[in-house]
Amino acid sequence: MQTSIDPVFAGWDGSVAQARQLQQQLAQRVALRDEVSAAPALLAGFDVGFEDEGQTTRAAAVLLDAQTLLPLETHVARVPTSMPYVPGLLSFRELPALLRALALLSRTPDLVFIDGQGIAHPRRFGIAAHFGVVTGLPSIGVAKQRLAGTFIEPGGERGDHSPILLAGAQIGWALRSKPRCNPLIVSPGHRVSMQGALDWTLRTLRAYRLPEPTRLADRLASRRGEIELQTQPTLL
């Protein structure tokens, strides 16, 4: 699909202070309502890794059949790393590579899962929210660790969950996706409701801690082996 990274940081002077200000402004554009088809055809998962001692950002994209959760396409995009890691500003470091990976997909996904925060973020604008606002695609953030808010530890069974609260408002879910594993931090990014983010993540879980879209993207981004593609994709 076609996309452009040119307008992503238009007007940003490169400073941390202005990046945080832009997050606060762009967070006003986030839509926390379900705008995903009841029967989507395609899902996508995205994750980022680094090469050359951090000098190159490596973004992985996996397109999946929404019904079978089998992978249809995998792509990797590489761009020079333009910013050091700053907590809470992950999208300013990784978004250009993610958008480059999105552009490699032959078809547009109906829903995107990103390894990172949605609105479960100090300024309610993590990388999944930023990605969604920039692309217009429904998005969900699935993170391995909490960045903001507090929660009561969910029960120990698969599917147990509890709300994550920040200043009295819910910003996400702590989800026990697999027994004896730490909970995932799940939150809507854009064009998905709070409940929708939880429901879609549960629908895409299999035998692993991570939902299939980000599990496969994580495997590709970290170069932990090849991904076998579905040889006869479902007719769309």
UniProtKB/Swiss-Prot annotation:
Q: Is Phosphoprotein one of the keywords?
A: no
Q: Where is this site: Interaction with target DNA?
A: 85
UniProt keyword Ubl conjugation, yes or no: no
Gene Ontology CC entries for this record: cytoplasm
Catalytic reaction annotation:
Endonucleolytic cleavage at apurinic or apyrimidinic sites to products with a 5'-phosphate
For this protein, what is the EC number?
3.1.21.7
**Which Pfam families does the record associate with it?**
Endonuclease_5
Question: InterPro entries given for it?
Answer: Endonuclease-V (IPR007581)
An example of a GO molecular function for this protein is:
deoxyribonuclease V activity
Gene3D superfamilies cross-referenced by the UniProt entry: archaeoglobus fulgidus dsm 4304 superfamily
Tell where it localizes.
Answer: Cytoplasm
Q: What class of enzyme is it?
A: hydrolase
GO BP annotations listed: DNA repair
Indicate which residues the UniProt annotation says bind Mg(2+): 47, 115
For activity, the cofactor(s) needed are: Mg(2+)
Keywords noted in UniProt: Cytoplasm, DNA damage, DNA repair, Endonuclease, Hydrolase, Magnesium, Metal-binding, Nuclease
Q: Which family does it belong to?
A: Belongs to the endonuclease V family.
Q: What's this protein's function?
A: DNA repair enzyme involved in the repair of deaminated bases. Selectively cleaves double-stranded DNA at the second phosphodiester bond 3' to a deoxyinosine leaving behind the intact lesion on the nicked DNA.
Q: Which NCBIfam families match?
A: PRK11617.1
* UniProt name for this protein: Endonuclease V
Q: Which organism is it from?
A: Xanthomonas campestris pv. campestris (strain B100)
Lineage of the native species?
Bacteria, Pseudomonadati, Pseudomonadota, Gammaproteobacteria, Lysobacterales
User: Gene that codes for this?
Assistant: nfi
